């Protein structure tokens, strides 16, 4: 007969992030002693890190850190395997610690971030590996963003109320305007534009869209004399869908995002949108 309760299993899962069967087995071996079970799972976790390398990490959280004066901001995406771990305090603390480190260290890229020391003698990569072992799941840090050249604001969106934010948006204006920054960030979260303006779309992307539009138009049997005009209309439609400034503003679709910015007298310098797993 088991010498532990369902509450012990729940507590052990909360402490370690391990699966239910692993927790029951650890409690069996520890004769119901939760502290010994935690130690056993941590040891097992260290041995199991390599085994988890091939597993998929598509859950997780996006975390933001914004300076008190809005002069800089950070987004960090940390991924895990299950929503159970994602909504746990331990996982979210790891993600927040990394975001705080990014805000202070300002690494140039992901490689620099992973190689930097988050604690004395411990790199971010080692910190992530430790979380991997402690939580019993594959933990992946592969994306972050940092703005520090204007008025920066973040908008975080939860796709489920019991999960941490799955979508994070960072916007940078040339001057302070919290209302416009928040509204535009909400728009970006909802509509996921790929580019800021037409000028930001690479020529090869435009050429590809133009080619697809022409082939589609010809396949539809449109008159030769009308093809050029139809193709141009479809390419312009692509720009409207893919570029932020030309989109109808989510909070007032009678205006474009560009119009909203112009009326407020601000310029959107850049933005980024991170969605967990995408």
UniProtKB/Swiss-Prot annotation:
It is found in: Cytoplasm. The keyword Glycoprotein does not apply. Pfam families: EF_TS. One of its GO terms (cellular component) is cytoplasm. GO terms for molecular function: translation elongation factor activity. It comes from the Bacteria. Its main location: cytoplasm. The keyword Protein biosynthesis applies. CDD domains: UBA_EF-Ts. Residues 82-85 are annotated as: Involved in Mg(2+) ion dislocation from EF-Tu. Keywords: Cytoplasm, Elongation factor, Protein biosynthesis. NCBIfam families: tsf. Associates with the EF-Tu.GDP complex and induces the exchange of GDP to GTP. It remains bound to the aminoacyl-tRNA.EF-Tu.GTP complex up to the GTP hydrolysis stage on the ribosome. Belongs to the EF-Ts family. This is Elongation factor Ts.
């Amino acid at each position: 007969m088991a010498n532990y309760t369902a509450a012990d299993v729940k507590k052990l899962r909360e402490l370690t992030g391990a699966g239910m069967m692993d927790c029951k087995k650890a409690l069996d071996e520890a004769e119901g002693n939760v502290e010994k079970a935690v130690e056993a799972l941590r040891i097992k976790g260290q041995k199991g890190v390599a085994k988890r390398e091939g597993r998929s990490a598509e859950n997780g959280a996006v975390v933001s850190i914004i300076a008190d004066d809005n002069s800089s901001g950070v987004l960090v995406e940390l991924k895990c395997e299950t929503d159970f771990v994602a909504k746990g305090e331990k996982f979210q603390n790891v993600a927040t610690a990394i975001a705080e480190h990014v805000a202070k260290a300002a690494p140039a890229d992901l490689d620099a971030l992973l190689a930097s020391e988050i604690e004395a003698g411990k790199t971010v990569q080692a910190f992530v590996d430790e979380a991997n072992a402690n939580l019993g799941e594959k933990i992946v840090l592969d994306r972050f963003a940092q703005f520090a050249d204007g008025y920066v604001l973040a908008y975080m969106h939860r796709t489920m109320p019991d999960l941490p934010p799955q979508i994070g948006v960072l916007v940078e204006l040339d001057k302070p305007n919290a209302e416009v920054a928040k509204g535009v960030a909400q728009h970006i979260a909802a509509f996921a534009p790929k580019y800021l303006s037409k000028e930001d779309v690479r020529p090869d992307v435009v050429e590809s869209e133009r080619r697809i539009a022409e082939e589609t138009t010809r396949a539809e049997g449109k008159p030769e004399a009308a093809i050029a005009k139809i193709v141009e209309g479809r390419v312009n439609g692509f720009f409207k869908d893919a570029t932020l400034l030309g989109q109808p503003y989510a909070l007032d679709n009678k205006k474009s995002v560009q119009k909203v910015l112009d009326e407020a007298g601000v310029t959107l310098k850049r933005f980024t949108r991170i969605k967990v797993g995408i």
